[in-house]
Amino acid sequence: MTTARAQGAAVVRRRPKDRKDQIARASAEAFSAQGYHAVSMEAIAAKVGISAPALYRHHASKYDLFRDAVLALGQQLVDCTDFADTDDREPGETLDRLIDALIDVTLANRESGGLYRWQARYLHGDDQSALGDQLRLVNRRIQRPLMVIRPTLTSPQRWMASAGMLSVIGSVVDHRVQLPTDEIRALLRAAALAVVGAELPEPEHTFERPSSWRIFEVDTGVYEALLQASMALFNAKGYPETSMAEIASAVGIPVSGIYRYFPGKCDILATGLRRAADRVSGRLSAILTGLTEPGHMLTLLIEAYVATSFANPDLAAIYYTERVNLTRVDQELLRAVQRSTIDAWMRLLAAARPALTETQARILVHAAMALVVDVGRLVHYEDAGDNSAYPQACVRKLMDATLFGTGG
């Protein structure tokens, strides 16, 4: 009897002390990998090893769980930079410490850090404001030492520098390229310092706006118009929140007319992203015809990539925010096209900077491309239109600094 009682006691399962932390980590990783709408409470509960009813005892709804996960990530950025408010070191030392702290937090959350970057649109009004407050506080903490180190920077330039620094560091959550932790930390640190040291152009200067092109030509027919309208709606509302009726209305056709061209909404997303990636890749390759100097070739690619992204802001953002809604096969096809583009840039960068390994060069290319979206959103590139020459020049300069490692 004593033995039986002991055996019964041995199988009693006690709740781990870090259950809340387990739930927070599992939910953040799930939402980041699959998107808000695709994740279920049951899936998160299973990942933690509890039942869905048990999970509901911690969080009243999926939205509550999502909100807590997003704001917890933002709070980690706030907490790791708290010291800057009372730091009495030299501004350069404070900036170095800020960079190191932000890199450490980002690497610790590499599986989930994309959540606040790409899924935060699903936060409700007050929660969206709370996240915005967190990120503004972190940016201002970065800008404070910059005001002393670089007193001639204007406020918009400081914001581009701090946002660019956060973008370069945060870009590591958007891919799975592996390096030893110390090596990737040093690489991101050097890139972040180059970005905040970049000599940004002055707005009163005259800038030649590089030629740009729309990836989808709506004047060529309903097919292209459907792709263009769909991408704009997916970017504005999110793929899951966009209906076929809204797409049809934007193009001026009945809903039934869409099915002459696409079997369903997922096919529109897959076709739009894949076709855009193919066309951008082909366009960029054509620019390099007959050229041989890798540094010059990369500079031309940067110019064309920025101009194309500003002319097609919906597509630049959707690649990051909505690809989780593709089927696994379509995700792999899209990754293959993107990988080919990244590889082409990587080879040029490795040739231009022989001290870099190919893996290091690949990470820097990802960082440079992330700048276009992150800083582009800061300057509202979707609304820039004919006034985009100056912000484009700034983004090009930040990309130059990231890739070539120079602030000037």
Model-flagged regions — what are they?
Residues 19, 26, 161, 222, ...:
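N-terminal positioning helix adjacent to the helix-turn-helix/winged-helix DNA-binding module
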Residues 22, 26, 30-66, 233, ...:
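Helix-turn-helix
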Residues 59, 67-73, 269-276, 319:
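Alpha-helical DNA-contacting segments of helix-turn-helix folds
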Residues 82-110, 286-313:
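Hydrophobic alpha-helical connector segments
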Residues 103-128, 166, 309-329, 369, ...:
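Amphipathic alpha-helical segments used for helix-helix packing
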Residues 126-150, 159-160, 187, 329-353, ...:
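Amphipathic alpha-helical packing segments from all-alpha helical-bundle domains
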Residues 149-215, 352-398:
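Hydrophobic/aromatic-rich alpha-helical bundle segments in the mid-to-C-terminal region
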Residues 166, 170, 212-280, 284, ...:
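Conserved small-residue-rich
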